[in-house]
Amino acid sequence: MIKGYLTKSLYKQFYLSGKEKALIERGDIYIHDLRDMILGCINCCLFDIGHVLKGGFEMSNVQYSEPKSVLSALQVIGDITLVATAQQFGGFTLPELDKVLLPYVEKSLAAARAKYRDLGLDEDTVERVASRDVVRELEQGFQSLELKLNTVPCSRGDFAFTTITFGQWNPELFTEEEREWLMTISRIMLQVRRNGHGKDGKPVVFPKLVYLYDERQIEADKWSAQLFDEAVRTSSECMYPDYLSLSSENGSVSEIFQQYGAITSPMGCRAFLSLWCNEEGRAVTVGRCNIGAVSLNLPIILKLAQLRHPDTWRNDFWRILDERLEFIRSFFKKRYDIIRNQKCSSNPLAFTQGGFYEGTKSPDDRVGDLVRYMTASFGITALDEATYLWSGRRLVEEGGDFSASVLRHLKEKLAQFKKEDGHLYAIYGTPAESLCATQARQYDRFCRDEGVENVFRSTEHYSPEYFTNSFHVNVTEDITPFEKQDREFTDFHLCEGGHIQYVRLDNPENFEAVKAVIRRGMKKGFYQGVNFDSAYCGDCGRHSTNVLFKCPHCGSANLSVISRVCGYLGYSNVNGMSRMNDGKMAEIRNRKSM
């Protein structure tokens, strides 16, 4: 914390202009992860773990041989994750991990078969016991990975925000045995998550799990269909996995998959890379990264226009918004230049060992042209509150016209910036984990300084303690999961650089209901999650749902409660304490449809 405070202060002092600092202090814009900017490192990434493992690699001046079993592969992946995440900030995704692990399953299987054949066992017995041994390796490997990612902080001092995506394969390119093992890899990973850890099976929150949903694949392949049901079962107990649609008629992720065959896995809780094709016209997703996010405080910008230009504020809002976008653009251009001139030794696993696309440079080389495939995110929050200031109605009442007009305006401006600057810019539906409270406080302070009323202090459905997450409807809306999906459809697809759609479930134990919500989200092209509060009682050891403070079985307050923070899960209550700020906790208490 001390280091973060120091680096944040130094960056503000030496890297930001006076105008940038003024806008940050008032709250018009928010530079995410400001404490890490001075280090010149990248943000979220889709790390090419398969490329790093294949043939061996070097880490911290030690040569690693390629793993000879799936157990050692998972153990080494855990080590790589802890080291690589210390060289960046933000989300670290291991994309399509099931397919990465398949060759190591085959190595383990071959070794086990040879061992049991040497013992003179018949072939049926050899297959049975060899498969049993490999399943046990998978169990131990995923248990080891979960324990590392939930108990061992990286050298930056925090836990690696890791995501694993899985579940997509082309049935025509894999044999029956390979498809069964692909299913088994993911089934064991899901089973380990459901079982939790320790004698009482206490749940964990990392890594985030994302199922890659291809409807045609599920219909054509029995192993895919079995895995989808296993995933839904796990979501109904653990909330994860979330689901990414690859086969919808809607959305850029599905479009890229269907046109290029490339999967754009999410990073962090909701970030997505922009489409980028190499010189041969191939869409490259794995091995790319983001350089950071800067978010707008739309309510402050709107209120500023209303106060400074009371007669023409509806026109002046767009002008002021464009000015703020230019500031963000200028900041990102500086970020691209800083990263371009970094030495590759600043992130050796990514830039010298193949973790990133073309990342096989020498340590003393500059990152250079690798920045051409990196994305920068223009973030938006509080579209619900902004809609109220614009129209006097909540987003669900107004119908989403204003929010869509804002996002379309951003999309047009970013297309212009991209053409002029040659950089990949994207609209990011900011998750606002703690920012939900920060921006609300900034708006409240701005109103006090200007001597005007903060309407969110006295208006039903709103709170001065927090702003609504990105484009989502107000958490207090009493609407059904299907209604929420419909209300957020347009804005979700306009925020191509960062989005997730989630619905709150009162009865997650209803498997068919959970499955119906997920399938509907997949038809709509969503990155879909389901929400409920998952509680574990430290006294009676029983699990409950949608409980925050008191065990319904024994009355104990000794609870560990996992809630959806925004796009990812976190502990909202551990024995009466929470790491979330007061604003986020107020939002969690008010949830009806989030």
What are these regions (language model features)?
Residues 1-372, 389, 393-560, 570:
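Conserved catalytic cores of very large enzyme subunits
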Residues 376-389, 408, 564:
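Contiguous, well-ordered alpha-helical segments that form the cores/surfaces of helical PPI scaffolds
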Residues 379-382, 497, 567, 583:
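Glycine-centered flexibility sites
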Residues 549-594:
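Long insertion/accessory domains within large nucleic-acid-processing enzymes
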